[in-house]
Structure formats: C-alpha cells, structure tokens
C-alpha cells in the first residue's frame, strides 16, 4: 500500500480504515490504534483480508510490469513482506504452542529425515576483505557502504549445532553454570527458569519439540532451533568454541549455502546432505 500510494496518482483505497487499524508503528503514516488493545480486533474477517491481499498483489504485479514502475521501491516492499511472513510463522508457532492438543499448522506437511553430518572445519586465512556493498542492486542501508576489514585466521564448522549436541549441553548442566554465560544472559536464564530451548518438553526421559508440524520426538540430527543469542553463546563457550563475528560470517557465507525457503513448506531448519 505504501508503494502503490506513492507511485500511483490515482490510487484507490480498498478500505480507508485500514491505515488506522494496521499501522503498527509508522508515525508519519498517521495515528495508530492502541498497541495493547490490538489483539481484541476481530474484524475485518479473514475473507475480507484475503480479498485485500489479493487486490494489493494484483496491483503490484501490474505496476511492476508498467514502463514507469519504480522497481527499487517495489523490491524494498517485497523484502519487507518476507519479514512479515517470517514473523507470522513465528507467531503461529508461539500461539499454537499453548494449545494442549499440539495442533499442526499444516497437516499436509511432511517431516524431513536429517542425516548425521560429519563435522569438518573450514579454514579462512588472515586477509583484508571488503564487506558491505556500494552496488546499485538492492541492499539495506545497514549494508552500506562497502569497506575493508581485517579478518584474522579462523575456522568455521561445515554444519549447524544439532539437537543431540544440545542435549549433551543440557545433561552437563549447561543452563545452570554461570561460567558459560554472559551476565545478562545468565540473569535472564535464572529469572525465566530456562532449562532447554523454547518449545522443548521432556516426557518419560524423552525430549519432544513443538513445531509447526505439531509435537515431535526430538530428531537428534536436526539443527537446534528456537534458542536465543544468550543460549547460543553459552553453548559455544561450553564447547570451547565461540560464535563467528559479523564480518567472519559475511566472509564465510560467500561460500555456497544450502538454503531452505518458505515455498518448501518445511518450517524447521534441516541439515544438508552429506557431500552437499
């Protein structure tokens, strides 16, 4: 809507009340409905919302195909929409997790069988590297400008930390040993009584994880998920390792990355295949 109303001089509102209802925090877009009361808004209903979405999608497609389209603004809008999709899945998992019947978000989704990946360490030599970008293609402001940074020698694992490895951390009382934690992290850990990743539950000596595909017995080979930065940092210290820096990760991620996209309808991270 922001893109369309800026570019199209004859833009017609689907519903003028939507600006007020759906403005989460954009001050320049006008007044906003009280944040603490937004959860009680039950109208417009799902059919009207889907029709609104369909209308906006069609207008964006038409605009992108026109000769006077502003592709930069459209691309920013598309990236922002992808953030919304990620947040909606996160909220859906959190909301459904309170249902005692452990419902599935998508009953048609199949589970992925994760392989036990052999861990290898990929080495990077000391170097001065360019990070960020000055290119004309899309980028966020925080990714600019391109500049040089000194990268000291480091190694990074070829695979993600698995649930099985995380259970070892739990069994070693990792959540109760302050020496592994940053100060704020350990305070939060104690205050909120963290003893495992979010959505994990132990029943009859077995660990279960609530996912968008319902509650499942933990797949020991699957990458761990639903953890905080504090937990990740504590695990790294317990492992006598550390997390990569922002610049180390930017350099390392220039290698081929095995991706998992929303279209796959696999709403959990999964391990790459051996040899991939």
Name these PLM-found stretches.
Residues 4-7, 154, 161, 169-177, ...:
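Short capping motifs at secondary-structure boundaries
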Residues 1, 16-20, 40-49, 69-83, ...:
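Alpha-helical scaffold segments that form or flank carboxylate-/histidine-based iron centers
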């Amino acid at each position: 809507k922001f893109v369309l109303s800026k570019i199209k001089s004859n833009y017609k509102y689907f519903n003028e009340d939507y600006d007020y209802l759906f403005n989460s925090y954009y001050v320049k877009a006008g007044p906003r409905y009280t944040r603490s009361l937004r959860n009680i808004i039950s109208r417009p209903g799902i059919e009207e919302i889907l029709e609104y979405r369909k209308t906006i999608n069609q207008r964006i497609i038409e605009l992108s195909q026109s000769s006077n389209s502003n592709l930069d603004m459209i691309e920013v809008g598309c990236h922002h929409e992808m953030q919304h999709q990620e947040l909606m899945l996160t909220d859906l998992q959190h909301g459904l997790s309170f249902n005692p019947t452990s419902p599935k978000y998508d009953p048609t989704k199949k589970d992925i069988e994760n392989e036990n990946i052999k861990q290898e360490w990929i080495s990077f030599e000391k170097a001065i590297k360019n990070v960020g970008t000055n290119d004309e293609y899309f980028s966020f402001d925080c990714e600019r400008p391109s500049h040089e940074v000194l990268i000291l020698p480091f190694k990074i694992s070829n695979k993600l930390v698995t649930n099985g490895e995380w259970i070892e951390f739990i069994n070693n009382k990792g959540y109760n040993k302050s020496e592994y934690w940053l100060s704020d992290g350990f305070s939060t850990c104690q205050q909120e009584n963290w003893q495992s990743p979010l959505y994990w539950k132990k029943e009859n000596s077995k660990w279960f994880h609530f996912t968008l595909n319902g509650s499942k017995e933990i797949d020991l080979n699957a990458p761990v998920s639903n953890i905080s930065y504090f937990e990740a940092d504590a695990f790294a210290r317990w492992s006598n390792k550390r997390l990569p820096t922002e610049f180390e990760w930017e350099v390392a991620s220039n290698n081929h990355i095995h991706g998992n996209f929303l279209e796959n309808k696999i709403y959990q991270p999964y391990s790459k295949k051996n040899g991939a």
